[in-house]
Amino acid sequence: MVSAIVLYVLLAAAAHSAFAAEHCNAQMKTGPYKIKNLDITPPKETLQKDVEITIVETDYNENVIIGYKGYYQAYAYNGGSLDPNTRVEETMKTLNVGKEDLLMWSIRQQCEVGEELIDRWGSDSDDCFRDNEGRGQWVKGKELVKRQNNNHFAHHTCNKSWRCGISTSKMYSRLECQDDTDECQVYILDAEGNPINVTVDTVLHRDGVSMILKQKSTFTTRQIKAACLLIKDDKNNPESVTREHCLIDNDIYDLSKNTWNCKFNRCIKRKVEHRVKKRPPTWRHNVRAKYTEGDTATKGDLMHIQEELMYENDLLKMNIELMHAHINKLNNMLHDLIVSVAKVDERLIGNLMNNSVSSTFLSDDTFLLMPCTNPPAHTSNCYNNSIYKEGRWVANTDSSQCIDFSNYKELAIDDDVEFWIPTIGNTTYHDSWKDASGWSFIAQQKSNLITTMENTKFGGVGTSLSDITSMAEGELAAKLTSFMFGHVVNFVIILIVILFLYCMIRNRNRQY
């Protein structure tokens, strides 16, 4: 009787426990299943942070002494309107300035020219041919004055004016290094970005000026360690690098060709560790660009920006692929952990899938699933005379063990992923070659010459009608004198001919 009562109590307690907690139907098992692991794909990009880089640098611009000298000469003769020798001979000449003169001009900040000759006529007109070197007159700089007059009848007239200028200006330089010998040389660039032969020893005469380098160009060499991003087509072949961008002094340089990469006043080369294959057709480094660095709008800087954009894009892809691979690796590790724990907690897999199922393992990684009932959401470890204990719902008669966990705190047990995201955008911008102060000085002197040659000033003394007739002062009087003299001579000759004919006719009438 007593044993029957004990058995009844145990059955009642078991039934109450099953009713209060979840219930799984072992008759509705499905499967078998295995947890699917994710593929871990390594990124195509490889980041090397300690790449040895050789940098050769020179000054961005160089001081160039620029000077010019020339003269305008008008040598005229007035023999009257009937004299075919009446004319004005104009001469415009630019003189080459020698090395010694350029250096002296630079020291004195003055240039040397000849004497201004204004309305020299008669024997004084020979002064036009006495000094064609331009010596004796030191000025800060001057522009010639175009003078013409031919108002001295039966005499020669000379007008001669000088121009000169001196400036120590900047011209942009470019450094070039030979791949075979690693020898480097500095070139001075013209307005189009082409190298010109300006040295400290030889004067270059071009564009109407003479120029010489003030000091010999020098360059420095240094070694640094930089972060380089290697892009690979074939992840399994370490020799398949097709692109390599390095972050150097906040600028991005393409070192894909393992040769000297020269931009403006800097050349960069890295230690050869691998052979770079041919680049994809979408962006060819070894094909000449449709633009030239240093042109108007600084297209060389646009090339720099393009390199930065490509670098940033490749870096972003690398970081995303690294993150994807890292997440997949963690997921696979988590899968192994889930399988291990699910052998103890049969509801784990169902909870992770947000589904009320229970798992029963057939082997180390294969299991069956069965549907289960689940209590509603709650904020306590107790529910309907049940308590959640050691991963399961069990019967509970001690309410003191119930805990309200509505105000819980989060505990961090892992760290965030560290990404390599350098700050870029501090690109070193360069001016256009033609914006160098030296070429601006040359362009300005050309403009001044064009302006002064468009305005002619006439010397001499004479008529007040020069502004109306566009003649030199005194030239109108000379022309009128020549005109009257010529007509008087013609009148006398015609009168003599008429008298001669009259006399002949009269004598002939007398004979008859």
Curated annotation (Swiss-Prot):
GO MF term list: identical protein binding
Record: glycosylation sites: N159, N197, N354, N384, N426
Spans through the membrane: 482-504
Keyword terms of this UniProt record: Disulfide bond, Fusion of virus membrane with host endosomal membrane, Fusion of virus membrane with host membrane, Glycoprotein, Host cell membrane, Host membrane, Lipoprotein, Membrane, Palmitate, Phosphoprotein, Signal, Transmembrane, Transmembrane helix, Viral envelope protein, Viral penetration into host cytoplasm, Virion, Virus entry into host cell
Top-level taxon in the UniProt lineage: Viruses
Lipidation (S-palmitoyl cysteine): C503
Assembly and oligomerization: Homotrimer; disulfide-linked.
Protein's recorded name: Major envelope glycoprotein
Source species: Autographa californica nuclear polyhedrosis virus (AcMNPV)
Organism lineage string: Viruses, Viruses incertae sedis, Naldaviricetes, Lefavirales, Baculoviridae
Gene (name only): GP64
